[in-house]
A protein has these predicted regions:
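Short aromatic-enriched loop/helix-cap "lid" or pocket-rim segments at secondary-structure transitions
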Residues: 3, 91-92, 121-126
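Short, catalytically relevant binding-site loops at active-site mouths
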Residues: 42-44, 85-86, 118-119
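Short, glycine-/small-residue-rich phosphate/pyrophosphate-handling segment
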Residues: 48-49, 62-113
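Short, solvent-exposed beta-strand-terminating loops
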Residues: 109-125
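N-terminal beta1-alpha1-beta2 submodule of the flavodoxin-like/Rossmannoid cofactor-binding fold
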Residues: 1-67, 130-166
Length: 166
């Protein structure tokens, strides 16, 4: 199936026409009231899997007639990122060019960041010599409640926007 199947005259679609296990998810998003997306950040960007998902989600919204981006409906969006970087020292590019597509089609997203991730239970079992397990644990223990509160607060704002049409 061509990646242009969603653009066939008279059969255009706002959902990717390629049928697989992602199809029902994309169909549900088209009817959703809000969307939360999350990705670890590797090499300053979202994962390849997230990028592929976002392309499958957003490409059908793109019109090659006028280059507009039109989703089935607008909705609150939250973009979450986890990374090894710190607030003052990270190379995250957020959701890159796909964030523009999300903002244009769905609405301006809110961001939630979780920094300096404590990645594994026992650092001694992995080739992670540049990290201090103790420093990672201390950072997590110090910031965990704050990270949970940020996630709660953004979820609350999303629910208010959905319920009250803000």
């Amino acid at each position: 199936m061509s990646c242009m199947a969603c653009k066939i005259k008279g059969k255009a679609s706002n959902v990717c026409k390629f049928k697989d296990t992602l199809t029902p998810v994309l169909e549900e998003i088209a009817e959703a009231d809000g969307l939360v997306l999350g990705s670890p950040i590797y090499f300053g960007d979202v994962t390849g899997q997230m990028r592929t998902f976002l392309e499958r989600l957003a490409f059908p919204w793109l019109s090659y007639n006028d280059y507009s981006l039109t989703a089935p409906k607008r909705m609150p969006v939250v973009l979450m990122e986890t990374m090894n970087g710190l607030p003052d020292r990270n190379n995250s590019q957020d959701y890159g060019s796909m964030e523009h597509c999300i903002a244009a089609a769905l609405g301006q997203p809110e961001h939630v960041y979780a920094y300096n991730n404590y990645q594994v239970k026992n650092y001694a079992n992995y080739e992670l010599g540049s990290f201090s397990e103790e420093a990672k644990r201390q950072y997590r223990d110090t910031h965990w409640k704050e990270d949970l509160q940020k996630a709660f607060d953004v979820g609350k704002r999303m629910a208010e926007r959905i319920c009250y049409g803000l």
